[in-house]
Amino acid sequence: MMNYMGYNAGNMGNHDVEAGHAVFDRWIKQCDFPILGANIIRTSDRETYLKPYEVFERDGVKIVVLGMITPAIPVWLPETLWQGLYFADMEETARKWMKIIQEKEKPDVVVGIFHAGGSYHVRPVP
């Protein structure tokens, strides 16, 4: 549906994670657009699991889209669904990536697509 609608970028949500790695990894590969996740970190090497952001140019305007998911996934869902991943704090992640984006990309506009809920408690980085 999202391909049909012509999405340019998307991000993960907790309901995507609920299906488990096999399903969300397949969904990501089936998308004709990048699924972003600046705060989804692989525990094996501490690199981002998904692309953190995507750059677009429209009518001479440079646009960066930054995507993140709630870091409450470990509180809401069993680890068997997201094993090997860590969900970093959104504010810290935004600050980190905004610095990189501003220095490297020099965008005219930054759009954040964030899937988040209410309050949560985050586990420390393993």
Task: Describe each model-derived feature in a short phrase.
Residues 1-126:
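Acidic, metal/ion-coordinating pockets
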